[in-house]
Amino acid sequence: MSLDISKYPILALANTPDELRSLPKESLPALCDELRAYLLKSVSKSSGHLASGLGVVELTVALHYVYNTPFDQLIWDVGHQAYPHKILTGRREKLSTIRQKDGLHPFPWRDESEYDVLSVGHSSTSISAALGLAICAEKEQANRKVISVIGDGAITAGMAFEALNHAGDIHPDMLVVLNDNEMSISENVGALNNQLARVLSGSLYTSIREGGKKVLSGTPTIKELLKRTEEHIKGMVIPGTMFEELGFNYIGPVDGHDVNELVRTLKNMRNLKGPQFLHIMTKKGKGYEPAEKDPISYHGVPKFDPSNHSLPKSSGGKPTFSNIFGDFLCDMAKDDDKLMAITPAMREGSGMVRFSKEFPGQYFDTAIAEQHAVTLASGMAIAGYNPIVAIYSTFLQRGYDQLIHDVAIMNLPVMFAIDRAGLVGADGQTHQGAFDISFMRCIPNMVIMTPSDENECRQMLYTGHKHTGPSAVRYPRGSATGIEVNKEMQALEIGKGRLIRETKITEKGERVAILNFGTFLSNSVEAAEKLDATVADMRFAKPLDETLLCELVTSHDVLVTIEENAISGGAGSGVIEFLMKNRLIKPVLQLGLPDQFIAQGTQEEMHAELMLDATGIEKQIRDYLDL
């Protein structure tokens, strides 16, 4: 979206941080208003993450105004809130392409800009990376400042506290900014706290504090009394005792929407030594009333008209796989009071809103704590309950040791409902569910199910729920196929697939069998019709249907495996391992996700580019057969 200078006269003068820093401080509030208006207009036309960015406009302006970025290194945790940062770092004109194929990356991305220090997408990584940068900056005596911005949700993850604990121990010069937009830590925002922040971050207080420590170094009793008195006074008005105990100098809470106050506080803190912690209070969706009232709905938005003060309603078409899972939970919980549903902060995305309201005593949101979520489930399983962990494929990676150590080794009946398996689309490399079959297939005791449609998904969820060991059902983001769902549930036989189509080739030509794992079944059948190939819906990536495999390999000349998972180590690799072990030598073409991190784009665009749509599957098979 090109910039209308008449509507954004100050923003037009701040295309880069150098230009921003040349502006008079008095112009910053007006700049924030223009930046917020531009962000709203651009995202409403292109879709993307909105509410988080609206909430950090003043913080973004203040950080780039005070610090000499990119020499000073600024890291945004997760990255949903980084749209204002992209606008102010030379990418304003391209913002309308964000999350689109060949467009701006949805998150800060090192290959995209020198201002993006860390490529992000998952939460709670910023403090660890900032600490590493700060350590190296001190070793090089670079006088470089390192800043990490983390939200009140992301800071609850264990990794963030591990980094805080380490930083407090080794005492590097670094700043952690806590963007608190949920009132989860404190509500003490106002003039008193802003004044207190000025005093506590100011040079006079700092010099008195440090000087007093030196004078009293020889009198430990008085020194300890003074330290406790300081902590007691600060503890009465400041919710930062925990961070002080971790070794940080805590400042705040500060009004995160007062840009001049932020600039003053950051300038005071810029030259302080040791680990610093600035706590700011913001409102997610700030400046656009519907987003302020409903920040969850406006977190990620489709294209919409801001003047309508509402988002477009869904067409009410095909249900999503997440909906299928949510309905399954509710149906099962009616008759199973030992069903326990666990999610690491993905209630809405995993389709669990209805369940959380109808069965609150059986619903557990662990916040951003995937490791804890998995081991929590193991404890419930040991107690004789039936836990189900609803988790995105990309986030299950974060609980891998717990999956092995706390579930699989004990062969506990924990089911993993793995959403966003395969290509997720606009969120790009960090969110593609490309590896779960590969990293689960090597774990003993695991059962891995790959439904081809929503009805099969429902039956597999039931199968996993009734299974006496660990199991996983993986399904993609987005709409299902639209077939009628059988409300009656019946457990499938573990490790058994089914034939969908049989070739009619008898004498001429090579007989091809397509072994489908997952929701590419319709694409496989369409390609098979053109090739007159056999199609098997394998259903289970582990254990494989060895009987069906033996039948197919003896009656066909070529096998083709297809899955929406990395080819390396995936279901196709399992097929080859079985054939080699049993000396069944036949050529096997493996189709799936290549050995690369796959960028953003729609699911349809990426399937076509990777030749995993029906046309691409047919072409890859023809090329392999040299037809």
Curated annotation (Swiss-Prot):
It catalyses: D-glyceraldehyde 3-phosphate + pyruvate + H(+) = 1-deoxy-D-xylulose 5-phosphate + CO2. Its cofactor is Mg(2+); thiamine diphosphate. SUPFAM superfamilies: Thiamin diphosphate-binding fold (THDP-binding) (SSF52518), TK C-terminal domain-like (SSF52922). Its EC number is 2.2.1.7. Mg(2+) binds at residues 152, 181. Thiamine diphosphate binds at residues 80, 121-123, 153-154, 181, 288, 370. It is an enzyme of class 2 (transferase). Binds 1 Mg(2+) ion per subunit. This is 1-deoxy-D-xylulose-5-phosphate synthase. It comes from Aliivibrio salmonicida (strain LFI1238) (Vibrio salmonicida (strain LFI1238)). The gene is dxs.
